[in-house]
Each structure stands twice: as structure tokens, then as C-alpha cells.
Amino acid sequence: MNLFGFLSLTAILASQTQPLMFSKLIGNGSAKYLIVHADDLGMCHAENEASFKAMEAGLVTSGSVMMPCPWVMEVVEYAKSHPNVDLGIHLTLNSEWKTYRWRPILPPEKVPGLVDPDGYLWRSVEDTLRHASAAEVEAECRAQIQRALSLGLKPTHLDTHMGTVVAKPEFLDVYLKLGKEFGLPVMLPLSMLENGNYTTPPQVKQLLPKVVEAGMPLLDALAGGVKSTEPGERRKEYISLLRALRPGVTQIILHLGTNSDELKAITSSAEARYGDFLAFTHPETRQQIKELGIRLIGWRELAKAFKAK
């Protein structure tokens, strides 16, 4: 083999072992792209109302819907009247709150490992990992996707509530499989697969070759770790995150809520959720994004690149 042939073969082999990055699919790999994402739509009215307002204000570029939750039909109606809204499916395998609970889409007897003794989805990721099989996870996640489609939603992507579908290698396998089956990109950052995160055990890193083999593009990173619940301080922390963004495609995950008795009755994180809403409807945040040269994008743009690859 001559030198040219050797170099060509080396390049081919390298491309087969390197993950496909969204930043390469959508254009300039040196640019800073940011998805500002609203999680937990459908959970309650306060979550929906704040998310809709923030998306209409222009800084929140996408969201995802919890199909088993009580307020999902409000999201369906909103999507009908706002056909350009960028919504994915927030694959939901947990029901974490103390008194406000939801069940799987499938009858509990068909997915017994997913439900607690009261018939609700387990509160913790650890309980789901302990009791549920990959087959049950696949069946329920597929049912959630099919439910969304049957209601007329046009999902742009899949992602995960509480990280459960990426917390175990067998579950991550299901996540990739369903993404390919339904032609939807899945939310996976390279930084998580390389370094782990709060739900991801070390063995998930071993699945990076499977992600490469599946041809599923990756985000570069998730940006998070905001601690303060006081609205002004919370906004400052988000601005610090914006200033620290690196080139590539990064996602910030928000949990937005209105300052309502409903949300306060559901969760102790109500103040932080209202803080997220205030931070990403605030003129200072918009100005910082502009000054930093950050390009806001949504999952619809990534989905188009995914389907065209």
C-alpha cells in the first residue's frame, strides 16, 4: 500500500471511531450555538404557561413534553395553534413529587417494573434502575412517542426526564433504537458520555462506540449547575454560563414556572423555576447573548440536519 492509500485508510478508520457532532452538521464548528430548552411541559399549568411565554419572548428555543402528565392536553392545544413551536418528547419514567403523581401510558400490569406499590411511576431513578427491565422501558417509551403522534404533535427530538434512559447501558440502547426507529435525534452530549454526570454511571461511557455505530449526532455539552434560587442571583449565574460557553452546540436545560400557588403546592423548586422564567425573559440576558455572539438554535434545525446527513 502506498502512502496515499495508507493515509486514506487511516482517515476512514478514524471517521468510523469518532462521534458525529451536530456542530459539524449545521455549519461552522468554531461558532457558539445554544439551545435554550424548557423541560417538563405538560407537568402542570404553571409549567406550561411559563414555558409558552418564554418561547414567545424569543430566548427559549425549544421544549419537551411529559406525555404521562395531567396537563399534556394543554400543550397539544397550544401546538395546534402554534405550529412552529419546537417540541420534543421528554421520555418520562419517573414521578418524583410527594403528592402529585402520574402513571405510565401503558397499563401498569404491562410494565410492572416501572411502577411503585401505588401504581405510579417510581419516584427515583435508582428505583427504576432496580426494578425495570429494558423491555419495559422500551415498551413505555414507544407508547409515549406513539401517544404524542396520535394527538397530532410533531416532535423534533427525544430527551429524558431525570436522565433515566441514559442511566443504564441497556436503557441507553433503547433510547438510540427509538431515535433511529422514529427518525428523531436524541439529546446526548459528548461531555456526558466522556465524563459522566449526576445520573450517568461509568459504564455508560463504554457505549460511546455504540453511539458512533448508530450514527446518532451528539451535542458538545450541557451547561448547568445553577444553584441560587433568588431570581437576580440566578440570572447572574446563567449569564456566567453564557460567558463560559465554548464553540460547538451547547444546551441549557430550564424548568420554567409561574409564581403560582399551584407550583408551590407541587414542588419545593417553585422559586427556582420562577427564577428560570425571569432570567430568560429578561432584557439583560438577551443583550448578553447578542454581545457574546451566541447563535440561538432549536431542535428543529438539528432535526433537519440529522435527517439530511
Question: How would you label these PLM feature ranges?
Answer:
Residues 47, 98-101, 197-206, 229-235, ...:
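Histidine/acidic-residue-rich catalytic or RNA/ligand-binding cores of hydrolases
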Residues 24-26, 51-57, 74-86, 103-116, ...:
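Acidic (Asp/Glu)-rich catalytic clusters
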Residues 186-187, 266-309:
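C-terminal domain-boundary segment and adjacent tail
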Residues 33-35, 60-64, 84-90, 155-159, ...:
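Structural preference for beta-strand elements that scaffold enzyme active sites
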Residues 25-98:
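Active-site beta->alpha N-cap acidic-glycine motif
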Residues 134, 138, 142-212, 216-217, ...:
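Catalytic domains of cell-wall/extracellular-matrix polysaccharide-remodeling enzymes
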